[in-house]
Amino acid sequence: AFFQGKNDRAQGFSYEHRGEKVTSVVYDFSIVNPPADIAAQLGIAEDDFAYHVVRVRQADEKPIVIEYTYMPLELIPGLKKKDLYGSLYRFIREQCGLKISSFHRTIRAVAATEEEAERLDTKPGSPLLELTQIGFLDSGAAFEYSVSRNVGDRFELHNVTSVSYTHLTL
């Protein structure tokens, strides 16, 4: 069956947790040549540069998710470490003037590594919900490749799915 999810806006962590005190702990902010498989997902050459961000997002001082993100340097100019403590999607919209149009997501269950467990205030091996996503701009360019690992009992996924009957097979 073919299903298509639809959101009316790019809803990141800050939006989903509006009304709560949202904070970030940044563990890495660097400019790198991304691994070949990630460069391919972003549609850039292996020798092109990308931001690499590792941060934990918290709601009301409770760690919810650890994010591992790559973004092409050329598409998102001027990103600074101070911007990582707020909404990256807001920075992309307001500071870069870009329009986020869609995400391709894969969701699966994984076990927390020792390092992730420490950063997320949980136990090693605890269940995490992993969202791997590629974010696209209205131009069709991929602006983000990220893997987010969410603490299972502190995360909810809300999705609206519409069925396209022209592609539906039973």
Write out the residue ranges for each language-model feature.
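N-terminal helix-turn-helix DNA-binding module of bacterial transcription factors
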Residues: 1-3
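Mid-protein regulatory/catalytic core that forms ligand/cofactor-binding pockets
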Residues: 9-151
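Acidic, metal-coordinating catalytic segment for phosphate/diphosphate chemistry
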Residues: 154-160
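Acidic, proline/serine/threonine- and glycine-rich low-complexity intrinsically disordered segments
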Residues: 162-164
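Conserved small/polar residues in nucleotide/adenosyl-binding loops
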Residues: 166-170
